[in-house]
Amino acid sequence: MSERKISTTVVTAGDRAFAWGALLLVASMRRNGMNHPVIVGMTGWTDDMKSRVASLGGVTLKELPPSRQCVTCQKPLLMMDDAIDTEWVCWADSDAAFVGDCTEWLCGANPDEIVIRRYDPPPADFTKENLAVWKRDIEKFCGGANAESRYTTRVNAPFIVINRKWKGFLETWNRQIQNVLPPDVEIIMKHGSPYFQTDESVLGSLLCFLPDAPKIAERYAANGSVDKSRYFAHFAYNPKPWQMWNSYSLKWHGVVRPVVDWLLENGRVKTDELPLALRKGWWPFWRALAPAAPWVWRATKLKRRLFKK
């Protein structure tokens, strides 16, 4: 990492199912010399997982308040935490890893802007009807809305960088999540819903219609568009690499394996403590199973739900 002063706190969160993801995320930072302070929101973690993540240093573990909403809906609550004393805050989803030293991408060029990726072209659910709902809800709960949307596409929020001067905006985002999303919402809603991507959609609505929202930065470099040796790798779709490998996630094996090896070499975890999907000897099996993984995963989840009943 460069010699400059650390000016960003990285924030992430996960329930029990994402604890290994959070460990991989923070480990990827430390492996690449990114010694930024990290806040991890958690719920349902074992003491062993808490110890493993804390052992990486500079990590504050915070038990999330009780909520029936998915963990991702607590993004703004964690990002505006009073314990953050850096100029910038970066949200990073816990199903991800940093490749290379990404220090440069953890700060914005302009404190008046939010760094977040925009979809281009707009997704199918970015309709006039959904925009009308966004505008209506901003008018209803926020005291007024822009006549027209600032943007013609919505945002993608696994990686966000914002200056701490926007704490009030984060508070508005948090309130609006409670205002417009169901109290028991999961990570996504019915396809076509104005708030299909839950907290991400709420954030998009504010950036489009809230008069005093930050502008979206034109430059988004965390996806490797500027430097392919330094980027934020987001493991989209289920199952996740620590659970089961699928055809999509196979491309991330070269990102995940070095982080797991680093954890082993530095005594942060033992081989027999790793999930089977992260054990080197099991890789041929998971690679062969990958095409069927989504169906196996759905069947496993269905079985768990049935037995809960």
Residues covered by each model-derived region:
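N-terminal anchoring/stem segment of glycosyltransferases
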Residues: 1-70, 84-85, 273-276, 280-309
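A glycosyltransferase accessory/donor-loop signature
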Residues: 2-6, 146-153, 164-309
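A conserved donor-nucleotide-binding helix/loop in the catalytic core
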Residues: 24, 64-104, 116, 260
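Short, polar loop motifs at secondary-structure junctions
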Residues: 43-48, 100-102, 219-222
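Active-site regions of enzymes building and remodeling cell-envelope glycoconjugates
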Residues: 53-64, 76-78, 112-114, 230-233
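Conserved glycosyltransferase catalytic-site signature
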Residues: 72, 76, 157, 196-201
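Conserved donor-nucleotide/metal-binding helix-loop-beta segment in metal-dependent transferases, i.e.
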Residues: 98-137
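Short, flexible, basic/aromatic active-site loop/helix in glycosyltransferases
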Residues: 136-150
